[in-house]
Design a protein with these regions (language model features):
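Helix-rich catalytic cores of soluble enzyme domains
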Residues: 1-73
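Active-site capping/gating regions of soluble enzymes
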Residues: 53-205
Length: 205
């Protein structure tokens, strides 16, 4: 596996048509080179959470970004059955006063993917993008509960998988087993969410 990340900000002016096009082209060229070498490209077009935009704006912009990415991937004759898409979930901006429920996050995210991603794509691995561990887990869980597509929906988290373990380790540097237990718990919670089997009460067990 290899990964290339294209980053997009949301504001009054961004993402511009030029940035959407240039990032899509770069992701497609990367994917072509990777598949020529017999590897699997992870294609990551990330629309950032930073800003005061609404979830509806995020939905519109993310759909534009993903659609353009796949247009470029097809121009470059990428085997879509041999890639993994790593998108953001549909969320309101971090400074927005228009936060939405996890149910809406799931429904908006699925709407975006169903309208933007070709059916040949086998798997979607979400980035956490600055969500808390619980938010990223709960949102992934509901996406899988409501998933009425053939896409496999899983996670490719950074902070939302590692934060608790790093915090524990920073205060207990010698306690390797304890750090591993904290990390394993978070990984187990995310794995259950990827199956639509997570619930909040499992966090305390």
């Amino acid at each position: 596996f290899t990964k290339w990340r294209g980053v997009y900000n949301i504001s009054d002016k961004f993402p511009s048509k030029l940035s959407i096009q240039s990032n899509a082209h770069a992701l497609a060229r990367y994917s072509a080179l990777v598949q020529e070498c017999g590897m699997v490209p992870i294609v990551e077009p990330e629309v950032l959470m930073d800003g005061d935009h609404s979830a509806e704006t995020c939905l519109k912009k993310t759909s534009e970004v993903i659609k353009r990415c796949f247009e470029e991937l097809m121009i470059h004759k990428i085997d879509l059955s041999g890639i993994i898409l790593k998108p953001n979930m549909i969320l309101a901006g971090t400074t927005s006063n228009k936060k939405i429920s996890s149910e809406k996050v799931a429904k908006y995210t699925l709407k975006c993917l169903k309208e933007s991603v070709p059916l040949e794509v086998p798997g979607i691995a979400f980035l956490s993008g600055g969500q808390t561990e619980i938010e990223a887990t709960e949102n992934l869980n509901l996406i899988n509960k409501y998933n009425d597509t053939n896409f496999i929906m899983t996670y490719s988290y950074g902070r939302a998988l590692q934060k608790s373990a790093l915090k524990f380790w920073s205060k207990n540097i010698e306690d390797t087993n304890g750090t591993q237990e904290v990390f394993n718990h978070r990984a187990n919670m995310c794995t259950l969410a990827a199956q639509g089997k997570w619930s909040a009460d499992l966090e305390s067990k």
